[in-house]
């Protein structure tokens, strides 16, 4: 099976690559159209700000390509947020919302934590919707590792939720696009199982 990690220019790819290799796969890191289209499974990791990430995707001419992918794609952390429509996380002085990949019509918003510190960093519990294959064999309220200050609110595509001040989407799914706000590659056995589930879909 051909597993490709999209080289977005805005992610630490080594930890994701290592986690996939530990599961017995040989992932390829690429931004080439032919390689991406030939993949059986794709991963879209991301760190940093939404506006910087979209700038990188635009420079690499990946935006139209990602939107038309038909194979399963897993967005990780910022990679999940990029599937939304807009983000409040802007680099510009005007503070305008950033247009994202618009795979789903949901915003990314700064977390309302009711006094809890940002970023939301560390281990927190994830409650998946019953029966979703991405969480097969993973206990309800399993702990995963988070680092973020922005989140997607609960919506039609939410398949798991987490509470930090407010409840937010910790995993989403729409058609062939899946996303997790946490870092499965840094989440021990539960994270490894989630990656395994995705790769075996």
Swiss-Prot record:
E.C. no: 4.3.2.10, 3.5.1.2
Record-linked Gene3D superfamilies: 3.40.50.880
CDD domains xref list: GATase1_IGP_Synthase
UniProt keyword list: Amino-acid biosynthesis, Cytoplasm, Glutamine amidotransferase, Histidine biosynthesis, Hydrolase, Lyase
Any one GO molecular-function label of the UniProt entry: lyase activity
Annotated InterPro entries: Class_I_gatase-like, GATASE, Imidazole-glycPsynth_HisH
Source superkingdom: Bacteria
Keyword tRNA-binding in annotation: no
UniProt pathway annotation: Amino-acid biosynthesis; L-histidine biosynthesis; L-histidine from 5-phospho-alpha-D-ribose 1-diphosphate: step 5/9
Cellular component annotations (GO), alphabetically ordered: cytoplasm
Subcellular location: Cytoplasm
Active site positions: 77 (nucleophile), 183, 185
Pfam families linked: GATase
Domain Glutamine amidotransferase type-1: 2-201
Recorded catalytic activity of this chain's protein: 5-[(5-phospho-1-deoxy-D-ribulos-1-ylimino)methylamino]-1-(5-phospho-beta-D-ribosyl)imidazole-4-carboxamide + L-glutamine = D-erythro-1-(imidazol-4-yl)glycerol 3-phosphate + 5-amino-1-(5-phospho-beta-D-ribosyl)imidazole-4-carboxamide + L-glutamate + H(+); L-glutamine + H2O = L-glutamate + NH4(+)
One GO term of the biological process aspect: L-histidine biosynthetic process
Subunit annotation: Heterodimer of HisH and HisF.
Purpose of the protein: IGPS catalyzes the conversion of PRFAR and glutamine to IGP, AICAR and glutamate. The HisH subunit catalyzes the hydrolysis of glutamine to glutamate and ammonia as part of the synthesis of IGP and AICAR. The resulting ammonia molecule is channeled to the active site of HisF.
HAMAP family: HisH (MF_00278)
Protein name: Imidazole glycerol phosphate synthase subunit HisH
Lineage, top ranks: Bacteria, Pseudomonadati, Pseudomonadota, Gammaproteobacteria, Enterobacterales
Encoding gene, per UniProt annotation: hisH
